[in-house]
């Protein structure tokens, strides 16, 4: 199974108010193993970045001035995610922004390019009801080192989320591993 653990950084909170993606990153997981393949791109949004958003990710409009626009990277991004399950923390936020960017290009929704979308925030809320379930809180709870995360960044956050997701779902492969081990030790007697 091929999965892309995905994150974006944006100019603000709402694409309906003209906010844009300024960074997108995905790390590839195949059969529950990181492959070291990733997609990462900073994007020129052709607009100002809200102060609140910049305080979260530290990315300035000046830094993005010479970066490509989403239209320039859309096809390579879509090729990277094609056919994969997307795993995203607070998926409606990122999917909403991706769909807004694709709509500006006359392209269909991101879900037409991927197998499915899994929201790790929803998973975390189901697994840890009543607890904080931010990426930082999950890293702390699952003992994943995020000490190098001073600001949000799409690639770093996708890498951390991959570790979080694999830890949160680690029991899901337990039965298949036991079955595979048992299947190897089964012998058939033909009478």
Q: Model-derived features: where do they sit?
A:
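Acidic, Mg2+-coordinating catalytic module of metal-dependent nucleases/exonucleases
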Residues: 85-91, 97, 134-190
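Alpha-helix termini
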Residues: 20, 38, 71, 132, ...
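Conserved non-catalytic scaffold segment of RNase H-like nuclease domains
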Residues: 1-115, 125, 137-151
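Catalytic subdomain that performs nucleotidyl-dependent activation
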Residues: 114-132
């Amino acid at each position: 199974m091929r999965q892309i653990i995905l994150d974006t950084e944006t100019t603000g909170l709402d694409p309906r108010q003209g906010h844009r993606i300024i960074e997108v990153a995905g790390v590839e997981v195949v059969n529950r193993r990181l492959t070291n393949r990733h997609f990462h791109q900073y994007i020129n949004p052709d607009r100002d970045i809200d102060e609140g958003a910049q305080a979260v990710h530290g990315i300035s409009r000046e830094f993005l001035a010479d970066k490509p626009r989403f239209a320039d990277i859309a096809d390579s991004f879509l090729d990277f995610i094609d056919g994969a399950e997307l795993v995203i923390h607070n998926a409606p936020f990122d999917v909403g922004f991706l769909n807004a960017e694709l709509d500006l290009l006359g392209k269909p929704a991101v879900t037409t390019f991927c197998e499915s979308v899994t929201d790790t925030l929803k998973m975390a809320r189901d697994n840890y009801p009543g607890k904080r379930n931010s990426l930082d809180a999950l890293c702390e709870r699952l003992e994943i080192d995020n000490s190098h995360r001073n600001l949000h960044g799409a690639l770093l956050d996708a890498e951390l989320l991959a570790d979080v997701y694999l830890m949160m779902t680690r029991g899901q492969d337990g039965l298949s591993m036991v079955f595979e081990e048992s299947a190897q030790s089964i012998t058939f007697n033909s009478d």
